[in-house]
């Protein structure tokens, strides 16, 4: 299937980015011609090299053989094509070995690669984000060795946090780090480690949170780099205990890894592990957004092609008509298209704001970062749920055919279900939005969003619709702010509040598409999706507002039901 449609949409979104003028000032050497060339080359690689691998990765999957993970034939060649093309280096500064391009451009490319194969693309993000983190905080000797190796793809990285009794509750981690004659050593077991072992690169660096002192909670945690092989090439005491047999993402080996006094290197200050790791985690959460949009785009395009080709119904005296002519199929397709285009716009806007948080004039960065922290849970979780919902919707359009492996929709459905689980579940993102972004930050990011979004309002009907939703979000936030002293009351509506924020940000993106997308075929296509979204906007916003402010009364039946 051609990637031209997706490429056209991405390039149009990039041409109408919010805060584009500020981004141009922050990246004066980055021009539209370069952006177009990069996106088009990414599409070629995705379509020609990565896409054909996905069915093989899914069908064969990674295997554990004699204690080592073996990937499927062709996986190594695909990885080599990605890294030799320099695709891990796009957003890093030249002095760090990168190309100095904006993060938003990397986000656009990630969407294309994830559309081709989410399982394949998952390996790239930890290495790139770990390299960026090391470039900022690691000791020179470690930085000078590991950063270029990670960016070249010769070595790869994992992020090791979860344990059997400590997933989202990081403060309960029990893996221990102790000093032995000046050498740090870690002992414990980590689970859910994506690409925890493989045969695609020569060395794997595990970036791990471990308890280095008896200080309570996260204050006792430090960040360590634990290589699977030591500098002399011998194996570290790192053992792959099993790989998980999963619903989807079969080509991405998810490992349980044991560490038995494994040699480790401290990254950053002792006792500041979570704080040191946090920038890497934020970057990985951002990458979840183009991951979800890419998978959703693949499912949507399959459904659209099928609906145009499949013939059923119509006048009994005439030949059957394409099912795309039926009103309910049109509704389904437009509903999926609206969500995909809006999520794409949110992902790119979030990446743009993160770019400005690190590259705008120093005095402006704090404001951009506050806005980024508001947008990030929306982009991450909205796109994660989008991927599964659109895959399910595409299956519905295909009918029984979609339920078979003859079509790739069921693979998208299986692969995407976990997106709203890893890198912070929906509930975790919702609590982050309520407790941190609204209460702790006093709604600073939300307020900045409202100021900037309202600046795009005009006097037309679309602006009136979006403006009313912005007002509704503001009043709902004020209600929840007043419940800060009764968090249990507010927590019952946290997910609804996150969704209301997403609806409002989506309304802003839809309004901008309607204003700026252009009058050619690509612009008309994007505007059709945006107008469908805007038509449902007041209904969706009102429903989420009511759920968000209903309070804990809606949960009163749980004791009786669970008894």
Report each predicted region and the residues it spans.
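Amphipathic, small/basic residue-rich leader segments at the start of a protein or domain
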Residues: 1-121, 145, 547, 553-563
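Glycine-rich cofactor-pocket loops
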Residues: 24-27, 56-73, 276-287, 301-337, ...
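Internal maturation/activation junctions in enzymes
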Residues: 62, 126-127, 138-175, 189, ...
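A structural-propensity feature for long, helix-poor, extended segments
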Residues: 128-130, 139-142, 146, 425, ...
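A short core secondary-structure module
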Residues: 182-183, 187-235
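A glycine-rich, basic-preceded beta-loop-alpha segment at the flavin cofactor/substrate interface
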Residues: 192-194, 229-241, 246, 253-284, ...
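Alpha-helix capping/hinge segments and adjacent helical runs
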Residues: 249, 366, 370-448, 532-560
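C-terminal amphipathic alpha-helical interaction region
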Residues: 440, 456-563
